[in-house]
UniProtKB/Swiss-Prot annotation:
Catalysed transformations (reactions): a (2R,3R)-dihydroflavonol + 2-oxoglutarate + O2 = a flavonol + succinate + CO2 + H2O; a (2S)-flavan-4-one + 2-oxoglutarate + O2 = a (2R,3R)-dihydroflavonol + succinate + CO2
InterPro entries: DIOX_N (IPR026992), IPNS-like_FE2OG_OXY (IPR044861), IPNS-like_sf (IPR027443), Iron_ascorbate_oxido_reductase (IPR050231), Oxoglu/Fe-dep_dioxygenase_dom (IPR005123)
Annotated protein name in UniProt: Flavonol synthase/flavanone 3-hydroxylase
Lineage of the organism: Eukaryota, Viridiplantae, Streptophyta, Embryophyta, Tracheophyta
Pfam families: 2OG-FeII_Oxy, DIOX_N
Subcellular location field: Cytoplasm
Keywords: Cytoplasm, Dioxygenase, Flavonoid biosynthesis, Iron, Metal-binding, Oxidoreductase, Vitamin C
GO molecular function: flavanone 3-dioxygenase activity; flavonol synthase activity; L-ascorbic acid binding; metal ion binding
Alphabetical list of PROSITE patterns matching this protein: FE2OG_OXY
Domain (Fe2OG dioxygenase) ranges: 198-298
Pathway: Secondary metabolite biosynthesis; flavonoid biosynthesis
Designated gene of the protein: FLS
Keyword Cell wall biogenesis/degradation: no
Organism: Malus domestica
Entry's family note: Belongs to the iron/ascorbate-dependent oxidoreductase family.
Cofactor: Fe cation; L-ascorbate
Amino acid sequence: MGVESVERERESNEGTIPAEFIRSENEQPGITTVHGKVLEVPIIDFSDPDEEKLIVQITEASSNWGMYQIVNHDIPSEVISKLQAVGKEFFELPQEEKEAYAKPPDSASIEGYGTKLFKEISEGDTTKKGWVDNLFNKIWPPSVVNYQFWPKNPPSYREANEEYAKHLHNVVEKLFRLLSLGLGLEGQELKKAAGGDNLEYLLKINYYPPCPRPDLALGVVAHTDMSTVTILVPNDVQGLQACKDGRWYDVKYIPNALVIHIGDQMEIMSNGKYTSVLHRTTVNKDKTRISWPVFLEPPADHVVGPHPQLVNAVNQPKYKTKKYGDYVYCKINKLPQ
């Protein structure tokens, strides 16, 4: 199918990168990163028996940062290690084998290998690209899983991802409950507002091969996630950056922690109480970075808006209410919401 591959670009342009990967000066990480300082976003012990304390920590981190890391989340380290191992093995396969899972051109689904989400940014005659290859799979609920796009090699890919999804489901249930309670709502309110048991878990494996000029390129351009919440597992290669007070900082890597991003739909449902985090990804000259974000998304036809219990004469709705699919269409195509 001839899927575009950054790995192929790297092999054919040793020591340099093509112009379409070189960002403008106001984006280049070599210029825009605050060097020598790693941003220590809040670290939250998810096993703390003091629920009131946990609610306060989650609420403050979701409001002030939009990003935090949770530890002691009860997902066994071996489950995370297996998830990482099978993802890495897939991307190390020959290009032709990976392309067997490419998204068909006429498919309405995002799932598959080598898919792109956002329209690439055009500057003059040059279309800018991120230094990254992708694989998208829906992993929960079982009713939306399409094994057509799940790699059969390595053979343990399915088992590792299903095991991770099962454990992640428990984390999601608890996190949504705490986020609801932090807004003064009943524990199930935000989950219901996001689609209830039909909330979809979209796994995206980001594969960032070594880049000869990491000072000029980005893996993923600055953005906020469209999801309600994104739960991310990185490998140990630095790359995640967050924007704080208008400046870009590396986010500290913590082994076996889950990185939480508040997404656009959570900001909307909370009527602005929780903040969708602006973040981006840099790349490394010598090492491959891989990350496993799971986007928790409402079904496309599910209507999302500020939660009715958070809106009154004093607190007017700050966001429009619309189908999630319409929101996605507008954001991908850079149309007004």
